[in-house]
Amino acid sequence: MNFSVLPPEINSALIFAGAGPEPMAAAATAWDGLAMELASAAASFGSVTSGLVGGAWQGASSSAMAAAAAPYAAWLAAAAVQAEQTAAQAAAMIAEFEAVKTAVVQPMLVAANRADLVSLVMSNLFGQNAPAIAAIEATYEQMWAADVSAMSAYHAGASAIASALSPFSKPLQNLAGLPAWLASGAPAAAMTAAAGIPALAGGPTAINLGIANVGGGNVGNANNGLANIGNANLGNYNFGSGNFGNSNIGSASLGNNNIGFGNLGSNNVGVGNLGNLNTGFANTGLGNFGFGNTGNNNIGIGLTGNNQIGIGGLNSGTGNFGLFNSGSGNVGFFNSGNGNFGIGNSGNFNTGGWNSGHGNTGFFNAGSFNTGMLDVGNANTGSLNTGSYNMGDFNPGSSNTGTFNTGNANTGFLNAGNINTGVFNIGHMNNGLFNTGDMNNGVFYRGVGQGSLQFSITTPDLTLPPLQIPGISVPAFSLPAITLPSLTIPAATTPANITVGAFSLPGLTLPSLNIPAATTPANITVGAFSLPGLTLPSLNIPAATTPANITVGAFSLPGLTLPSLNIPAATTPANITVGAFSLPGLTLPSLNIPAATTPANITVGAFSLPGLTLPSLNIPAATTPANITVGAFSLPGLTLPSLNIPAATTPANITVGAFSLPGLTLPSLNIPAATTPANITVSGFQLPPLSIPSVAIPPVTVPPITVGAFNLPPLQIPEVTIPQLTIPAGITIGGFSLPAIHTQPITVGQIGVGQFGLPSIGWDVFLSTPRITVPAFGIPFTLQFQTNVPALQPPGGGLSTFTNGALIFGEFDLPQLVVHPYTLTGPIVIGSFFLPAFNIPGIDVPAINVDGFTLPQITTPAITTPEFAIPPIGVGGFTLPQITTQEIITPELTINSIGVGGFTLPQITTPPITTPPLTIDPINLTGFTLPQITTPPITTPPLTIDPINLTGFTLPQITTPPITTPPLTIEPIGVGGFTTPPLTVPGIHLPSTTIGAFAIPGGPGYFNSSTAPSSGFFNSGAGGNSGFGNNGSGLSGWFNTNPAGLLGGSGYQNFGGLSSGFSNLGSGVSGFANRGILPFSVASVVSGFANIGTNLAGFFQGTTS
């Protein structure tokens, strides 16, 4: 493993994972103790042998014994020195480890950096997070460099320490002078063979006895390893259940060669020991014998320290409640870990018994954050799981929901593959039973992607019966009166010089539109009905005065550029058919307009209109498309019935009170020269031949004419009768040509007309026109003309006061008029019309001053209109022709800025206004039938509008004084009763239609939306989930969620990472209804029931520390 290329997630995790420096410290202590024991043994051995030689044992044998023992005593002394040196090197290694642990980046910081990166990338829809993402990545690179530097220093220090260790010399295998046949052990081998015991081949057998075992030679269920006897062991040669390690006898031990339950370490005998070589219960350290000892090489109960014998306190740790606890903060018995609630826990913050892992709720768990029993993995909800993140039992794999799954992320039972939903699936990502292939739906599939499901939704063939909607009677009702309270608008001033920068409206493309053919049902009958009467109440508008001197600052409207518009060619569908129909008769009731009087003395204060500058306008050349073709068509026959217009009389004595218009000063107006564009081309056409000789009209001058006051006498016109006139058919007008006609300039001088009066003009007889019939006719013609109109300058003029008398019209009748069908012989071709570009120069209109003036009172008497009847109008069936237009392109048009000078709005005062009530009687409509209309499919081509550019401009400052509106009351409005007409809709046939189809392809699970594959149902998030409704990564169970960047969890409705149990919130939480308060990237380590905080176990604990 090359740490220099590993990311900081792995390097930091490797340093902070595991047991930390404690095993090395224990090893250093053990080596130190071994050195002392070896030195003591060497001194004791030398003393004993020398005592024997110099004392009780004399002779040759004594000398031979001393010679044989001397090498062994020397080896013991050398081994003691080497053991002491090894202890020193172990202490140096601890220092190196502590240094690198301090130097590397904390894993939670790396996880937070990656979580922030994921959050920024997911929300980076428009690239707005690019700087923040770059900063996050730069910090991540610094973390990478820091970890590589720390690991390099650690590697160098560890290598130096390891190279300083010298290998131990091999101890003596045989005593000096021992016969070879005895030293070789041949008698033992001979005895074994003689007994007939066969020698076992090296290595375990590959056959398992049980369910869901991974490995070989296992007896039991859910073991992962070799030659385990029991259930859920992770390792080799274990006897028992839930062990994590090798050669353990018992259950829930985390380590090697332990005998007992819940030991964390190696070579322990007993229950709940934390360390190595302990014998007893709940010892913490090395080589202890007894109960609840903390330290090394103690013999007794509750001792704290090293190499002690005796009985100490009931608890050797601190803050415990119970007996024989060697850890701290425990509640219970024989706990060697810290913060536990229960019995025999060697891990930390467990709720239950004999847990060697951390943060578990349950019993005999060697893993961490489990809710259940005998779990070796982490964050499991269930029992006897050697994998992690499982909800169920006996799962050697991870993230499974179910039982006996040796694969990963399965939902079901006995699945050997991964991401399966079902039972006994050996392949991967299957839904069903006994599938050996991959991504199948069903049973016993061996291929890939077999058994997909297809569904389609099809409507049946339906015929809707005719629908008759009867008339509905709506009784008369009145809307309630509405009162609008007085409203006060405070004075306000907009900020000056608000600048709006130039901007462009984006281009717009309208896609092609397809309108399918449609036919309305024939003969929809609408029964006769009447619109209800309506009464509008009198309206009182109180007096109001606008605030004086509202000031609007000078401002300029920005320039506007309209882009060229491309209107594609279009063709209307041919043969749109409209069936014959008749419009119903319509009766308009008599309308009474009551008398009304405008209030007198409406005063408008003096004001000035600001100067206005109109910029020069450039209208580019434009050309209409040539050859617009209108297909032949026939207009239907149209019958207009006779129309009776009753007599009408305008009210007499309409009085306009005297008033004075204010003085009006019109400033000089400068209209610059204008030139029409040259080369206006009208496509040629011909009038029939017509010969008129040239006519020359000389200049005509009319001198000033003055007409004084005069009176016209009464004028009597006798009865005039125009006889019937018949124009015969077949009249033909031959072709003719109009020559050019030239007129000289004509000047009309000033004409004045004095005051005069017109007498009453009228007639008291009826005017009657005979029936007029216009037969069908055709007009073939071609029109050509050319004209030139010189400049025309009208002089100023004035009109003095005049009065007109009453105008009286007698009754008259319009007879029925029949227009027969006529035909326009096609095709009719309109040639192209070219209009060249021309310029309109700028026009400067200076300010106009208007003095204050008063509007007079105007009175109108009541007006009554008689009843007016329109009989039905009949229209025959007709067909609209096809119309084709060529593509039209409009050129770009630019409108320059328009400047407006500052100005002040005058004060306006209006007195109260009262309108009289108005009543509209009901309007009657006879029944009628809607025709059938058929339209073929219509397809419109795409239309693109290019961007429109606006230059920057500045908004003027506007100041308004306070405005207060008086209360306004609207009286009730009455609506008379009416009946909706009956409506008949004929039957409609709906053919069978397929609305849509969907398929469930072969793949893992059902209705999952996770990024990576998941099994189960309704799972989302990063993927690798199983179960139901989980959102995240590596989850199992029901409705669990882990935030982005976190992995694993099981149970029901948990939110966080590395959690198990039910309804927990936080990471590193197990049990029921617990809440961890640390960030989700950090394990809160909470177990038990309803706890809130961090590092808690038990029931209903609460802390924020």
Curated annotation (Swiss-Prot):
Output the GO biological process annotations, alphabetical, semicolon-separated. response to host immune response
Q: InterPro entries, per this entry?
A: Mycobac_pentapep (IPR002989), PPE_dom (IPR000030), PPE_sf (IPR038332)
Q: Which PANTHER family match?
A: GLUTAMINE-RICH PROTEIN 2 (PTHR46766:SF1)
Give the record's family classification.
Answer: Belongs to the mycobacterial PPE family.
Entry protein name:
Uncharacterized PPE family protein PPE24
Species annotation:
Mycobacterium tuberculosis (strain CDC 1551 / Oshkosh)
Q: Which gene encodes it?
A: PPE24
